[in-house]
């Protein structure tokens, strides 16, 4: 089972962003069997260039649910699923970032349709979602909105599944994303390091 998703964010400093919209389509390989689409109040300002790109502004999100209010639904709809996204590294990072703020370690296997497309559909000048689906004749509406991009990714992924007849390429591109508790602790410590140039002393207590 697959959870095909797209996330829109506030933009801004790396790992200081917030999710503004999320769309998840639960896909059994043939059809969508469940879906979740929601605006999200990121509790931080959206960068102006992102407003221009997505059309999502701060006023639209003022009364939207905060991430903790939709977190349970996200866990439930993705439980036992492989997360699929166009540039999955970004979407998965954003989910993990929001869950980490809640003190929850969110882990799922992931597949990236950018990487899969380059292997199964070689020869295109661009593998951006908009240009790729246009070249493939896949309709896309509401570009740069979560539901429109995620639904186009569903159609693209179905095409990729059909191309990979023995599923060997998809299997070889599956990322397990299992992070040990020790590594998670180190990542948190690294994130807390100051950005200023200087000499720092590390003590092992």
Residues covered by each model-derived region:
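Extended, hydrophobic interaction surfaces within ordered domains
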Residues: 57, 68, 112-175
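Structured loop/turn residues at beta-strand edges in well-structured enzyme cores
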Residues: 104, 111, 195
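Conserved non-catalytic scaffold segment of RNase H-like nuclease domains
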Residues: 1-108, 122-144
């Amino acid at each position: 089972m697959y959870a095909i998703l797209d996330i829109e964010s506030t933009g801004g400093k790396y790992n200081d962003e917030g999710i503004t919209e999320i769309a998840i389509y639960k896909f059994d390989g043939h059809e969508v069997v469940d879906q979740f689409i929601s605006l999200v109040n990121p509790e931080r300002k959206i960068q102006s260039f992102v407003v221009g790109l997505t059309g999502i502004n701060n006023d639209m999100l003022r009364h939207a649910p905060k991430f903790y209010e939709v977190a349970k639904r996200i866990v439930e709809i993705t439980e036992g699923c492989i997360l699929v996204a166009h540039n999955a590294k970004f979407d998965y990072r954003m989910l993990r970032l929001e869950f980490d703020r809640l003190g929850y370690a969110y882990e799922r296997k992931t597949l990236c349709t950018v990487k899969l497309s380059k292997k199964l559909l070689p020869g295109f000048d661009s593998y951006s979602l908009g240009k790729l689906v246009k070249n493939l004749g896949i309709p896309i509406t509401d570009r740069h909105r979560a539901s429109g991009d995620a639904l186009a990714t569903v159609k693209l992924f179905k095409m990729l599944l059909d191309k990979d007849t023995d599923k060997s390429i998809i299997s070889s591109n599956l990322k397990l994303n299992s992070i040990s508790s020790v590594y998670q602790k180190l990542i948190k410590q690294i994130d807390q390091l100051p950005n200023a140039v200087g000499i720092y002393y590390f003590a092992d207590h």
